[in-house]
Amino acid sequence: PDAIAQLLNEGKVQLFCADAVDGEGLLNGDLPQRRRAELQEKYFVYLTAELAPRILTLNNAKKGTQIWTAGVDLGAYHAVHCRLRRPTLFAGAVGMGGIYDLTRFWGTDSDDMVLRCSPLAYLQENGIANKPALAKAEENCLILCAGQGAYEGDALDDTQALADLLKDQGMPAHLEIWGGDVSHDWYW
């Protein structure tokens, strides 16, 4: 990552990569919807209760240490989901080509666990996202972007819908819509 090479070399930034369980949970059509949502919630708990504290411990919890999340596609979902639900733990997020409407994967039936895992749904409810903390956040603490190229349609729709919903609720986010040359493909 040449864009942040200097920050990495100076020790100002560290990168951690968390493997996901999307194949076992969210994308596993052989499991009931509730079980898939439970696995997503367990992964969220792992990120927030184990990985993030471990990152802070590795840095001796230096004052001012901030954790940002970033991801592409379902990684964007996880990154933004963590920021929305735990904004006091995660200082910011960058979601690139993200899917935020999980009904695409598990249908429209909903219960408390399914709701808890679906940003476009839970932001319309109270008690799941920390809305007061999100409303105080700076705009550039949540960056949403999507392209207009091949295979980017669902991500573009969800990214725009999430940005609109956040704006309507007074929660700042920075939206970037990239051109038709930005596709939803592996070489990115």
Explain the meaning of each model-derived region.
Residues P1-W188:
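Non-catalytic cap/lid and distal C-terminal segments of serine-dependent acyl enzymes
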